[in-house]
A protein has these predicted regions:
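Short acidic-glycine-tyrosine-enriched beta hairpin
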Residues: 69-85
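A short, N-terminal "cap"/entry segment at the start of jelly-roll beta-barrel domains
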Residues: 1-47, 118-120
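Ligand-binding loop in jelly-roll beta-barrel domains
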Residues: 86-111
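Short strand-connecting beta-turns/loops that link adjacent beta-strands
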Residues: 29, 70, 96-98
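Residue-level recognition of conserved beta-strand positions in structured domain cores
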Residues: 34, 60, 67-69, 85, ...
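Short histidine-centered beta-strand/loop micro-motifs
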Residues: 22-24, 43-50, 67, 73-74, ...
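A hydrophobic/aromatic-rich effector-binding and dimerization subdomain
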Residues: 3, 104-120
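Short, conserved beta-strand element in jelly-roll/cupin
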Residues: 49-65
Length: 120
């Protein structure tokens, strides 16, 4: 078995014409992604409506997430959100410098309302 480290903060392309999502790990129930955003945002009048629960942390940069049914949230490095399945949301803005680095964990659950946000 060959186990070697990797870094979420390396191999960032200089040019990012669109948001870059890289799958780091995946099985039938979980997908872990690194997402790179450089001034990117959701298309106007577009809302994400995902079938999976998503836990996402902003590791670098700043961003704002809006929701259909609640106030927008500004995110700074270290801030994380637990987005239940079908929580309609969008990215209003992200910083270009520094590039935003996100770590997202998508969880496919039998009952998507059956989750616990530890720390609340």
């Amino acid at each position: 078995m060959n186990i070697s480290p990797a870094s979420l903060f390396t191999d960032i392309p200089r040019q990012l014409p669109e948001e870059l999502c890289q799958t780091l790990f995946q099985n039938p129930n979980i997908r872990i992604e690194r997402i790179l955003s450089k001034g990117h945002y959701s298309a106007e009048n577009t809302w994400y409506d995902q079938t999976q629960t998503e836990w996402v942390v902003l590791l670098q940069g700043q961003a704002r997430i809006s929701f259909v049914d609640s106030a927008p949230i500004d995110l700074n490095p270290g801030d994380y959100l637990l987005l239940p399945a079908h929580c309609k949301h969008r990215v209003d803005w992200t910083t270009s410098e520094p590039v935003c680095i996100w770590l997202a964990i998508h969880i496919q659950e039998e009952n998507s309302n059956d989750y616990q946000n530890v720390g609340d």
